[in-house]
Regions:
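C-terminal low-complexity, Ser/Thr- and acidic/Pro-rich disordered "stalk" regions positioned immediately N-terminal
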Residues: 368, 375-407
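Glycine-rich repeat segments that build the extracellular carbohydrate-interaction surface of secreted
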Residues: 41-57, 69-77, 158
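Surface-exposed loop/turn motifs in large extracellular/passenger domains
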Residues: 63-73, 87-102, 110-132, 139-164, ...
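Sec-dependent signal peptide cleavage junction
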Residues: 15-27, 403-410
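Sec-dependent, cleavable N-terminal signal peptides
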Residues: 1-24, 434-435
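A cross-kingdom C-terminal cell-surface attachment/processing module
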Residues: 411-432
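Acidic Gly/Asp/Thr-rich repetitive segments characteristic of extracellular carbohydrate-active
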Residues: 24-52
């Protein structure tokens, strides 16, 4: 009996050790079922799942692991499907591989949805391809923040390709959600559609490119570096309470029906439009007045025109305080600023103490400089010309009389020299006559 009990105890201990051994090592998966199982079994200590083969998902997988910062290492493999793949409620990081969807439906979908306070990071070795087939009539985004998001975070260090990039649901009213782009979004449609409230940062090294680079309809957008680019032809915005309003512009600013206000800060980076597009387009398609829409351009390089539609023109939403432009943007200059013209480019500078350059308006110059108006209506700053008169110094005696100059006067010397030469000439001629 004792031997039997000892054997049972040994088996239990062996099973326990096996369980601990599994928990201490990352899970390896090779198909949809083992992926789902591994996600369900993940713990704070055992939080990494690694693919050993390509995985096809025919239905979405929920990631909802409280207290677990899940890491899915794609292992250089691909997770593919034809619709929503991941419904995310807790922190997850994808790295080292590809997530690929080809959609063939009529509704609008996202490959990955963030919910609540979910946090998603796409590392720099990840590609998310959110494509659609030729027969699809609905749009597909790679990542979306769902309408219940609060303190959700999306960080894009990798690359997004396909139909559209990332979006914030338009019904979100809390300014607690965060989108950070350090990587690349290169798509056919909208690279970023920021319909709802949140804070979005575009940083150095980022590339945000599509028919429309970014359309923001609520919240805050900070362009701190990188490139935001449009590849399309500009189309005037139209009212739309459930979708995008315009295309063909690198940066589209159009307040939503939710009337939550917009602040855009262009601090650095490049904003580029195609030849028939616009770099920046601001409008008020929902007739909200535009008083709470602010677009501040303090730096960067803007290639393409700035279009402020009549619907928002009275609100004067654009204020240029710095940056370089391919077009004349003097009508958008903030107070105290002026445009310096350098060939085919214009740079916004402070209109004070200007000592050189050509400008689109008359600049303010200090003493010793003048402004010359050119035939093309521009103004050039030049230094005022003058002459220098040399006044030799003398020593003054105590009786008030002046002594001889201390400094050699070249003018007087020349005069004396000429006089002596003339006298010598007369003497020489006179002597010759005497001979």
């Amino acid at each position: 009996m004792k031997k039997a009990l000892a054997t049972i105890l040994a088996l239990v201990m062996a099973i326990g050790l096996c369980s601990v051994s599994w928990a201490a090592n990352p899970a390896s998966v090779s198909n949809a079922e083992t992926l789902k199982t591994a996600i369900g079994a993940a713990t704070a200590e055992n939080n990494t799942i690694t693919l050993t083969d390509n995985v096809v998902l025919n239905e979405s997988v929920e990631i909802k692991k409280s207290g677990v910062n899940l890491v899915i290492d794609l292992g250089g493999k691909t997770i593919s499907g034809s619709s929503l793949l991941f419904d995310i409620y807790s922190p997850v990081t994808f790295k080292n591989g590809t997530i690929d969807v080809t959609y063939n439906g009529s509704a609008s979908i996202c490959v990955m949805w963030l919910n609540g306070g979910a946090k998603l990071a796409l590392e720099n070795d990840v590609i998310v391809n959110a494509a659609k087939s030729a027969g699809a009539t609905g749009s597909v985004f790679a990542v979306g923040l769902y309408n219940d998001c609060d303190e959700a975070e999306l960080t894009i260090n990798g690359k997004i390709t396909g139909d559209n990039g990332a979006t914030i649901n338009g019904t979100i009213t809390t300014n607690t959600n965060k989108v950070t782009v350090n990587g690349t979004i290169d798509v056919a449609g909208h690279a970023l559609y920021l319909a709802g409230n949140g804070i979005t940062d575009i940083n150095n090294g980022a590339c945000v490119k599509g028919d429309a680079g970014i359309e923001i309809r609520a919240g805050v957008l900070n362009i701190n570096g990188g490139t935001v680019e449009s590849t399309g032809t500009y189309s005037a915005p139209i009212a739309n309470g459930n979708g995008t309003t315009a295309s063909g512009a690198a940066l589209i600013v159009a307040e939503h029906t939710t009337n939550q206000g917009i602040t855009v800060n262009v601090n650095s980076g490049n904003i580029k439009a195609a030849s028939n597009g616009k770099a920046i387009a601001a409008s008020d398609p929902e007739n909200k007045g535009g008083d709470d829409v602010k677009l501040n351009v303090a730096g960067g390089n803007v290639v393409g025109g700035i279009q402020v539609e009549e619907s928002i023109e009275a609100a004067k939403p654009v204020a240029v305080t710095g940056g370089t432009f391919s077009t004349d943007v003097k009508e958008y200059l903030a107070e105290g600023k002026i445009l310096q013209k350098n060939g085919d480019t214009y740079t916004a500078v402070t209109n004070s103490g200007i000592t050189s350059g050509t400008y689109t308006a008359k600049p303010t110059v200090p003493d010793g400089y003048k402004v010359v108006e050119n035939t093309d209506g521009t103004f050039t700053v030049e230094k005022v010309g003058g002459y220098y008169y040399y006044q030799p110094t003398t020593d003054t005696k105590t009786d008030g009389t002046k002594g001889s100059p201390k400094t050699f006067d070249a003018g007087i010397a020349l005069y004396v020299g000429m006089a002596l030469t003339s006298a010598a000439g007369v003497a020489f001629v006179g002597k010759k006559r005497e001979d």
